[in-house]
C-alpha cells in the first residue's frame, strides 16, 4: 500500500501564522487597555466601589500598525477622568517616528514605490501614495521655514550658481531656474544660505535673490564666487558694494574651450592653467598677456579675445590669503551640491511648477547640509584674520 503524500501550501501556512500572531497581539493590547482603564478608575467594569474615580462610557476604535500587521484597539471611553493610556502615547511617538522616517527617505532620494515596499517590509503594511503626499506637504512647511530662516553671523565668502530643471506647463516643457547660495562663515564652516526661483539668470533675478538674502541678515560678504551670468556682476555691486567678484576659473576655461579646436585643446589648457599658477596677481596678468599673444600666433583669435576680455575677473582671489586660493577661485563646492540635486531630480523628471522644483531642491540642500558636509570645517579663517590685522595696523600707521 502506497503512502499518501501530503503537500503543504507554504504561503497559506505563513498567512495563517501571521494572522494568528496578529490576533494574539490585538487581544493582548486590548487586554492591556482594559487593565489600564481599571487602574485609572480604581474599579473593574460594572463594579461598584467607593474608591471609583470615573465611569466607563463605551469604546472607540483606533487602528495601530505593528510589525505583526494592522490591529484594532478598542480604547475605553471614561467619564470624570482623562484616559491617557501609555499604549496610545507610544502609538503617537511611533506615528511621529514613522512620519519622520518616511520624510527622510523621500528627501534622501528614495522613490515613492520604494518607500511603499520598505514600509511593508518594516511594519507589515504599505503606506499609500496619498499618505506620502500628505507627509511631503508637512515636509514642505518645515523646508519653507528652513529656507526663510534668519541668517546670523558674517559670511566672508559666498558661492552662487543656478540650477536648471524642467517643468511641464500645459504640455510644453520649459526651464525652471533655481538660484542657490552657499556661504563660508567666519568660523570656516559652510552653510546653505538659501535658494530661490529665478525666471532666468539675469540681473533682475540675481538682484532680487541677493536682496532677499540680505533682508534675511546676510552681511560681511567680501567675495562672491560664481560663473559669469548675465547681470550678476552688476547685481553684486548694487546689493553688496563692499564685496568683490570672483569668476569661477573652471567655467572661464570652458568658455574659452567653446572656440578652441579639439586638436589644440591640450595646449590651450596648459596655457590657461599657467596663468593661475602664478604667485602674484601682477605676474598672472603678465602671463595672461603672453597667452593672448600666443593664441593669436596660433590663429585662435576668438580664444585670444575671450582670454583678454575675461581674465581680470578670474584674478580677484589674489587679494585674499594664498591658503584660500584653491577654494575661492572656483565654484566646485556648489558644483558638487548641484550633482546631488540633479541625482534626486532625475528620479522625478519634470515638475508641474517652479514651486515644486524649488521645494525638492531645498529638500535636498537641507538634507546634504545635515550630513558631514555641514559639520566639517571647510577652511581655516586664521589667515584672513591675520591679513585683516596686518591691514588694520598699516592703516593705523598711515593715519599716524
Q: What are these model-predicted stretches?
A:
Residues 1-4, 35, 43, 107, ...:
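Acidic/histidine-rich catalytic cores and adjacent linkers
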Residues 84, 256-290:
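Metal-dependent DNA phosphodiester-chemistry modules and their immediately adjacent helices/loops
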Residues 223-230, 235-271:
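Conserved beta-strand -> loop -> alpha-helix junction used to position metal-binding or nucleic-acid-contacting
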Amino acid at each position: 500500500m502506497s503512502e499518501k503524500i501530503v503537500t503543504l501550501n507554504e504561503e497559506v501556512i505563513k498567512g495563517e501564522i501571521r494572522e494568528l500572531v496578529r490576533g494574539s497581539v490585538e487581544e493582548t493590547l486590548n487586554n492591556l487597555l482594559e487593565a489600564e482603564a481599571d487602574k485609572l478608575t480604581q474599579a473593574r467594569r460594572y463594579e461598584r466601589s467607593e474608591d471609583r474615580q470615573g465611569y466607563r462610557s463605551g469604546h472607540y476604535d483606533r487602528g495601530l500598525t505593528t510589525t505583526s500587521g494592522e490591529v484594532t484597539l478598542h480604547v475605553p471611553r471614561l467619564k470624570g477622568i482623562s484616559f491617557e493610556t501609555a499604549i496610545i502615547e507610544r502609538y503617537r511617538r511611533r506615528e511621529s517616528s514613522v512620519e519622520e522616517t518616511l520624510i527622510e527617505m523621500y528627501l534622501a532620494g528614495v522613490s515613492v514605490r520604494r518607500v511603499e515596499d520598505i514600509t511593508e517590509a518594516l511594519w507589515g503594511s504599505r503606506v499609500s501614495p496619498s499618505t506620502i503626499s500628505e507627509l511631503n506637504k508637512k515636509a514642505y512647511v518645515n523646508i519653507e521655514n528652513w529656507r526663510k530662516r534668519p541668517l546670523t553671523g558674517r559670511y566672508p565668502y559666498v558661492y552662487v550658481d543656478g540650477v536648471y530643471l524642467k517643468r511641464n506647463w500645459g504640455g510644453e516643457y520649459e526651464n525652471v531656474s533655481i538660484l542657490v547660495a552657499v556661504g563660508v562663515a567666519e568660523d570656516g564652516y559652510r552653510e546653505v544660505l538659501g535658494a530661490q526661483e529665478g525666471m532666468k539668470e539675469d540681473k533682475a533675478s540675481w538682484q532680487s535673490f541677493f536682496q532677499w538674502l540680505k533682508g534675511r541678515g546676510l552681511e560681511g560678504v567680501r567675495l562672491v564666487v560664481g560663473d559669469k551670468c548675465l547681470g550678476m556682476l552688476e547685481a553684486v555691486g548694487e546689493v553688496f558694494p563692499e564685496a568683490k567678484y570672483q569668476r569661477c576659473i573652471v567655467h572661464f576655461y570652458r568658455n574659452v574651450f567653446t572656440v578652441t579646436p579639439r586638436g589644440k585643446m591640450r595646449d590651450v589648457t596648459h596655457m590657461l592653467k599657467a596663468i593661475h599658477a602664478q604667485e602674484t596677481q601682477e605676474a598672472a596678468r603678465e602671463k595672461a598677456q603672453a597667452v593672448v599673444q600666443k593664441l593669436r600666433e596660433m590663429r585662435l583669435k576668438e580664444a585670444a579675445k575671450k582670454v583678454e576680455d575675461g581674465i581680470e575677473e578670474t584674478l580677484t582671489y589674489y587679494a585674499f590669503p594664498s591658503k584660500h586660493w584653491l577654494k575661492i577661485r572656483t565654484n566646485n563646492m556648489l558644483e558638487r551640491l548641484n550633482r546631488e540635486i540633479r541625482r534626486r531630480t532625475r528620479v522625478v523628471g519634470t515638475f508641474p511648477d517652479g514651486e515644486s522644483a524649488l521645494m525638492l531642491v531645498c529638500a535636498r540642500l537641507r538634507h546634504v547640509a545635515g550630513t558631514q558636509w555641514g559639520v566639517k570645517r571647510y577652511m581655516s579663517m586664521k589667515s584672513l584674520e591675520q591679513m585683516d590685522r596686518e591691514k588694520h595696523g598699516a592703516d593705523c600707521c598711515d593715519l599716524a
